[in-house]
Amino acid sequence: ESDIGFDKHIPSIFSAGVPFAMIPVASAEALGRASPAHGALSPALGATEVFVYARADGNAAHSFHARMFAPEIGIVEDPATGSAAAAFAGVLARFEDLADGWHTFPILQGAEMGRPSLIGLEVNIENGALTGARIAGKAVKVSEGVLYV
């Protein structure tokens, strides 16, 4: 528990359509120790998906390092979660002191499971409020299917 939170960041629920419990941790080491606790989050809490994140080392090519767990819906860990990155825009607007304009925050996710993904997150701040977000990244097709109705 002593590893939870850093700077102004505290655990919170944020959503860009899908609610995520956003859990800041103090270091990459604490992030590496994170593991899903099946049943720990109930729908009454408002989120069953958990996005655990830490600020990256100053020498890293990314701003934040993250992991996403959703065992309640059958996802042990996800290597890249665009919907969580979109919700993370709200975290940045709330807990970072951002000047007006566009800001870029690359997020490394999936490294602990051997599937590192770099998600590009850009946020726009106007008059101190979040007014826009853009998510970018590359994907690898892992399956394909056809649904006939």
Task: Give the predicted meaning of each segment.
Residues 1-149:
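Active-site proximal loop and beta-alpha junction motif in alpha/beta enzyme cores
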